[in-house]
């Protein structure tokens, strides 16, 4: 949250425009007003409803032939505001009847980039995503087909085992498990309540990351971000979870509390998080490198005080290199750790030299060496590191 003092931002005008544009989406008669702001490209595809932009056609922007209605009031978030433009996000949950008595729910997220002038409002950019909550009533077990409906592929994750006879997938804050042999579908975990229109479902600042699945269907996974229900409701952090397929029960292995916002947690987990073959999980949270033994349920901090770019990982993230000095321009030691074998290797240099990680070529570590007198840090924090030798 950022508190900003000022005047002349025309926030009331921005909000009025956004709400009017948003409400016009659900009324074909008023959609003409919205169409005037679109910049439809010649090659637009009007049946692409999962991802819509200012370059999309009128049909796609107004949901094509779908008859949708809002299940929740629009939830408005002010993302950016200055004297030049303002960015506003709108989230809501929609529904449509896909067959007699079968209701499908969707999470809708819109982003508006606007500029105000005394003459008119300019829509500089518009992006919208639409993702379906999984509906188990439309599974085609006879053909072993699971339809996820309207989805953005980047928001779907899945793992499978037992030659594909067991599959687990995460979509819209829900974790589902399907056993092909028994044709059974289970909702393992859900950040959304059974009442989809519950306002807590529309926060959008939490996620699920799948770690592993064995041939018995047991699953390790993470729930991270703002926890909106359960015993950690209202807290921010990472839950390390285990699902037992035999008992159909979830168990919390560990909970790592943090003040980091969801976007930062997601970025850190995408940058580095690794589960080795011995069910030991590694991740970085607020500068601490955690080693969590999922079987023994033990959490150990291997390193503290890590700063941006002080950890470098191989492509498969099984090997990491850590610069031991927080101040890069003072660093004289790098420790490399193989997270599968646990083996460590140290690289050092003389007192008149400095070293820093360059990266990995496959699993081969590369680092650079520079003369200490030539390494400097500017007033804006940028480090100049003229490498004289590559190792």
What are these regions (language model features)?
Residues 106-108, 169-170, 233-237, 382-387:
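Short coil-to-beta strand junction motifs in C2/discoidin
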Residues 105-111, 206, 331, 353-354:
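Short, surface-exposed coil-to-beta transition loops
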Residues 56-102, 206-215:
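Surface-exposed, charged secondary-structure patches
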Residues 113, 177-179, 240-242, 291-293, ...:
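Conserved blade-register residue in beta-propeller folds
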Residues 84-127, 133:
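Exposed beta-sheet edge and beta->alpha loop/turn motif
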Residues 327-338, 343-379, 383-391:
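Extended, charge-rich low-complexity regions and/or helical-solenoid scaffolds
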Residues 185, 249-253, 297-300, 342-344:
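Predominantly a core beta-strand signature of beta-propeller blades
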Residues 1-65, 141-184, 191-193, 197-206, ...:
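Core segments of small alpha/beta cavity-forming domains
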């Amino acid at each position: 949250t950022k508190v900003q003092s000022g005047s002349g931002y025309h926030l009331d005008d921005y909000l009025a425009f956004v709400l009017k544009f948003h409400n016009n989406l659900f009324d074909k008669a008023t959609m003409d007003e919205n169409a005037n702001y679109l910049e439809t490209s010649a090659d637009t595809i009007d049946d692409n409803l999962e991802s819509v932009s200012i370059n999309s056609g009128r049909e796609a922007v107004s949901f094509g032939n779908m008859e949708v209605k809002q299940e929740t009031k629009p939830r408005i978030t002010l993302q950016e505001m200055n004297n030049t433009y303002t960015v506003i996000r709108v989230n809501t949950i929609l529904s449509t009847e896909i067959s007699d008595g079968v209701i499908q729910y969707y999470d809708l997220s819109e982003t508006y980039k606007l500029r105000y002038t005394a003459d008119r409002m300019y829509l500089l950019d518009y992006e919208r995503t639409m993702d379906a909550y999984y509906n188990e009533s439309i599974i085609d077990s006879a053909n072993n087909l699971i339809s996820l409906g309207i989805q953005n592929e980047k928001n779907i994750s899945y793992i499978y085992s037992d030659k594909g006879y067991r599959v687990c997938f995460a979509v819209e804050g829900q974790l589902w498990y399907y056993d092909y042999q028994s044709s059974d579908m289970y909702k393992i975990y859900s950040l959304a309540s059974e009442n989809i229109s519950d306002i807590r479902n529309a926060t959008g600042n939490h996620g699920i990351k799948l770690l592993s699945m064995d041939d018995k269907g047991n699953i390790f996974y993470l729930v991270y971000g703002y926890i909106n229900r359960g015993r950690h409701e209202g807290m921010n952090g990472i839950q390390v979870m285990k699902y037992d397929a035999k008992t159909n029960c979830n168990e919390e292995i560990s909970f790592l509390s943090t003040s980091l916002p969801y976007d930062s947690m997601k970025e850190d987990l995408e940058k580095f998080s690794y589960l080795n073959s011995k069910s030991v999980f590694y991740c970085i949270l607020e500068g601490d490198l955690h080693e969590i033994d999922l079987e023994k349920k033990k959490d150990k901090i291997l390193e503290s005080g890590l700063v941006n770019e002080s950890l470098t990982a191989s492509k498969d993230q099984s090997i990491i290199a850590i610069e031991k000095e927080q101040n890069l321009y003072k660093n004289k030691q790098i420790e490399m750790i193989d997270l599968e074998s646990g083996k460590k290797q140290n690289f050092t240099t003389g007192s008149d030299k400095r070293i820093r990680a360059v990266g990995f070529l496959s699993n081969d570590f590369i680092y650079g060496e520079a003369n200490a007198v030539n390494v400097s840090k500017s007033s804006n924090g940028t480090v100049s590191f003229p490498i004289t030798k590559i190792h």
